[in-house]
Amino acid sequence: MIDFELKQKIDEAKKKFEDIIKVFHPENKRKELEELEKQMGDSDFWSDQRKAREISQKAQRIRKIIDDMKDIEAKFEDLDAAIELSDEDQSFVETIKEMVEEIEKKVKTFELELILNGKFDASNAYLTIHPGAGGTESQDWASMLLRMYMRWAERKGFDVQIVDYQPGEEAGIKSAMIYIKGDYAYGYLKYERGVHRLVRISPFDANKRRHTSFASVNVIPEIDDDIDIEINPEDLRIDTYRASGAGGQYVNKTESAVRITHIPTGIVVTCQTERSQLQNKETALKVLKARLYQLELEKRQKQLEEIQGELKDISWGNQIRSYVFQPYTMVKDHRTNVETGNIDAVMDGEIDIFIESELIHFAGIRNKQ
């Protein structure tokens, strides 16, 4: 027989799953999937390849969510069977505890899958970091953030590649861009965009004073080549230079680095990690396309804010998180108020506590609009 505390955990997991299902409307999703599969069966389905890909990807996402829902339902059935057996055999209690932990994780993942339903949420991501004012201290902070995000991506099983890396003169970085490849990479990271604040006793200060430093993080999705963003070659200035970087497995030092300036907007994109100038140019153009698309989205968002009134809480330009090393240790997200004292784990990439709370928080804001 299971104790009260374990029974309470089971009841909470069941209620959470039931609440999610109410929002999900499984029957509506099944009908939507049937309609999409019907379209995919048409003889002229691939005549418009861009639209066909969008439909195929949407069907794939819905199919996965339905399959995951069925899997959780089956897990609950197995759990109920184990609970019945535990009335006669106490050895099942430990098995039940393990089953409940697995179900809780699956329910949380399922909830996030439903939240990650934006147009580009399933895309790969480009993440850029720039230090704020403050010289070496800020540049060192930017490099700490770079490592944090790379460790997070590796923990997720994502592929990570440094696209651009500009080392600081004394320590740290002047800027860096990484490409993160994996399912929902952009969806997970999109709310990491903003200003990150560090408070610590600076190792670069001989007087051991406490310093506050800032670094900005920007995240954009990898945009499909078929997206309607026109780039006029006459609007581009393309420069080449010798690559420089951190070395190791991430940066291929060659003389083929490319810098592209989009003259009308002033956007500058650099790439130095591919093996040839042509490959670097192609990657830089892809990033430029994504940046221009982001710029267009921001213009539309600004228009919506003017009509609806600005929701300051979801402004990505504000300071979003503080990382305090001294006089105490704490990492706090200023939007969700989620915090932890285990700053070493956070800097080693354990940031899902913040990412998951961000997604749930902003999903709630969208639902109220």
Curated annotation (Swiss-Prot):
Superkingdom of origin: Bacteria
InterPro entries referenced in this protein's UniProt entry, alphabetically: PCRF (IPR005139), Pep_chain_release_fac_I (IPR000352), Pep_chain_release_fac_I_sf (IPR045853), PrfB (IPR004374)
GO molecular function, one term: translation release factor activity, codon specific
Stored Gene3D superfamilies: 3.30.160.20, 3.30.70.1660, Release factor
Signal peptide residue numbers: none
SMART domains: PCRF
Keyword Protein biosynthesis: yes
Keywords: Cytoplasm, Methylation, Protein biosynthesis
PTM sites of type N5-methylglutamine: Q249
UniProt subcellular location: Cytoplasm
Alphabetized Pfam families for the sequence: PCRF, RF-1
Function in brief: Peptide chain release factor 2 directs the termination of translation in response to the peptide chain termination codons UGA and UAA.
The family this protein is said to belong to: Belongs to the prokaryotic/mitochondrial release factor family.
UniProt xrefs under PANTHER family: CLASS I PEPTIDE CHAIN RELEASE FACTOR, PEPTIDE CHAIN RELEASE FACTOR 2
Entry protein name: Peptide chain release factor 2
Organism from which the protein derives: Thermosipho africanus (strain TCF52B)
Taxon lineage: Bacteria, Thermotogati, Thermotogota, Thermotogae, Thermotogales
